[in-house]
């Protein structure tokens, strides 16, 4: 028979040659020379290990699995490999077909290889839509249960991907510096930045004196060059998909400000998207549904949300065309003239400003509003109730949380839930001062890839929840959130903590107030254990 595949004790596939298979060239030459000389020779003495295997094979007490494994061992040791047609198992043939499908679909094979390893290691992943669709045909349970490290097909696929990627590198003549120019833009896409940190790149020197906590940036066994190339390819692929989706939505006349507001509320508070916006996103290839089993950071809607925020921010800075204000009423004009009058007392000025704010409010809102705060700017469109209440509390020191909430939520029945969410967020925020630190110099290394918005305005690191990060921004608490926890005395280690995703801890606190789950692995995350996951970035 042409070949048999059997599972050995470790669940790996082994191959062997049966009696009906063709002999190797060396065996054929030795038999031909022996017959031509007409002098039969005794076979060479068997090694002790081979003799032991033969004695075991003659034993009747062997199980079928052990007997098959013993028969496979001599062929593997002696190098008597059968032809390619007989050597390939069904799983190997299926793995080769998967690779061919990925190549035809334009997938990044190096990224698939890296992400497949992460799936088998139960780490966060980031496949493109094409890669995900192809793999789901062969691993349908991947989103729910992952892929077992004992899967024969998965191991065959990893081996085949490794061989194909190596061949592509040999054939490619693209200089590595082309990848260097784009690999520095870490976290430009929310998906790309997560996976880049899971496949750390080359280490760059940084000042040891500037680091307050030593960082292990040299884990063993990393393919540094392939990590940089994979990071650049993932960033370019994800950015192209997102830009195309934004272009099509703009051409279709979608209200991008409304889309940004709805996406922000959906991500932060899980408020459902309006049906028309959901259909618009699906029409450009973005499925907004976030299943429970999928890590939040892995979802493409986060990458799209960050790109949408950048696009609208650039529009606001470039479109500074002056517009005439609407005509004011006579009463409002009189109050404005009074405000420009220098002899006003502070109490008079505050009363006039408050009356102008009340005039601008709808009548129903004024009737239902229970209290007024001394400082109360309007709520932004992309600002949820928790974020707005925290901002009001900061602008009005000493104001009770319940009073702050009652100042802008008209329905008394809806106030208590917001109060509970705010208090949960306020419990997390003070933990920032207790976090372990990573210096800015270490954070800006190629492995971690942080880019401060003050130093890199065109290529800044974006928060997981949208805005660009900067240590000089007084309204932000910049942290790196790890996938795996470690106790407080231990410094950050890329090998132990795995991926490090940068974000604003204030935004994270708002997210955890509504849903206390780690955005990278869905584990519980609250004020009690956040110090095991988060690292404070310091100058």
Swiss-Prot record:
Positions with biased composition (Low complexity): 181-194
UniProt name for this protein: Effector protein hopAB1
Pfam families, sorted: AvrPtoB-E3_ubiq, AvrPtoB_bdg
Domain of life, per lineage: Bacteria
Localization of this protein: Secreted
Expression induction: Transcriptionally induced by HrpL.
Biased composition (Basic and acidic residues): 18-31
Family per record: Belongs to the HopAB family.
Lineage: Bacteria, Pseudomonadati, Pseudomonadota, Gammaproteobacteria, Pseudomonadales
Function: Effector protein that plays different roles depending on the species and plant cultivars that interact with the pathogen. Acts as a virulence determinant by enhancing the development of disease symptoms and bacterial growth. Acts as an avirulence factor by eliciting hypersensitive response (HR) and plant resistance.
Span list, region Disordered: 1-93, 163-220, 230-249, 315-336
Cellular component per GO, a single term: extracellular region
Keywords: Hypersensitive response elicitation, Plasmid, Secreted, Virulence
GO biological process: symbiont-mediated perturbation of host programmed cell death
Bilayer-spanning residue ranges: none
């Amino acid at each position: 028979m042409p070949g048999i595949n059997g599972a050995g004790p470790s669940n790996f596939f082994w191959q062997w040659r049966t009696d009906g298979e063709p002999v190797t060239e060396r065996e054929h030459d030795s038999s031909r020379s022996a017959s031509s000389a007409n002098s039969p020779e005794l076979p060479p003495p068997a090694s002790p290990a081979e003799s032991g295997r033969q004695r075991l094979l003659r034993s009747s007490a062997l199980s079928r699995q052990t007997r098959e494994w013993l028969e496979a061992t001599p062929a593997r040791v002696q190098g008597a490999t059968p032809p390619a047609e007989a050597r390939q198992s069904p799983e190997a043939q299926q793995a080769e077909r998967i690779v061919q499908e990925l190549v035809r679909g334009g997938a990044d094979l190096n990224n698939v290889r890296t992400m497949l390893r992460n799936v088998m290691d139960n780490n966060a992943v980031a496949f493109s839509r094409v890669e995900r669709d192809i793999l789901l045909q062969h691993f349908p349970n991947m989103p729910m249960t992952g892929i077992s490290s004992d899967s024969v097909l998965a191991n065959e696929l990893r081996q085949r991907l490794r061989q194909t990627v190596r061949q592509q590198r040999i054939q490619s003549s693209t200089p590595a510096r082309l990848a260097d120019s784009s690999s520095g833009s870490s976290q430009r896409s929310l998906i790309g930045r997560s996976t880049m940190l899971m496949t750390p790149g080359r280490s760059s020197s940084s000042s040891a004196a500037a680091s307050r906590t030593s960082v292990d940036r040299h884990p063993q066994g990393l393919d540094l060059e392939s990590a940089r190339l994979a990071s650049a390819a993932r960033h370019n692929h994800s950015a192209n998909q997102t830009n195309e989706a934004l272009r099509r939505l703009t051409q279709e006349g979608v209200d991008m400000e409304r889309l940004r507001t709805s996406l922000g509320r959906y991500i932060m508070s899980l408020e459902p998207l309006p049906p028309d916006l959901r259909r618009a996103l699906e029409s450009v290839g973005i499925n907004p549904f976030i299943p429970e089993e999928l890590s939040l950071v892995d979802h493409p809607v986060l990458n799209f949300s960050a790109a949408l925020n950048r696009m609208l921010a650039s529009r606001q800075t470039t479109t500074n065309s002056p517009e005439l204000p609407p005509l004011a009423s006579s009463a409002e004009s009189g109050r404005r003239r009074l405000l420009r009058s220098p002899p006003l007392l502070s109490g008079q000025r505050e009363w006039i400003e408050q009356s102008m704010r009340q005039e601008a409010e709808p009548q129903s809102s004024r009737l239902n509003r229970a209290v007024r705060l001394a400082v109360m700017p309007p709520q932004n469109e992309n600002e949820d109730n928790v974020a707005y209440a925290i901002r009001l509390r900061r602008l009005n020191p000493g104001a009770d949380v319940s009073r702050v909430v009652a100042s802008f939520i008209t329905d008394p029945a809806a106030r208590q839930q917001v109060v509970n969410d705010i208090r949960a967020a306020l419990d997390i925020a003070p933990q920032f001062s207790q976090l372990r630190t990573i210096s800015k110099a270490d954070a800006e290394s190629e492995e971690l890839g942080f880019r401060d918005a003050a130093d890199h305005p065109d290529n800044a690191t974006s928060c997981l929840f949208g805005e660009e990060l900067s240590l000089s921004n007084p309204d932000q608490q910049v942290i790196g959130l790890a996938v795996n926890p470690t106790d407080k005395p231990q410094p950050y280690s890329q090998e132990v903590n795995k991926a490090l995703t940068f974000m604003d801890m204030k935004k994270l606190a708002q997210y955890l107030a509504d849903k206390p789950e780690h955005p990278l692995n869905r584990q519980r995350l609250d004020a009690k254990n956040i110090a095991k996951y988060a690292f404070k970035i310091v100058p």
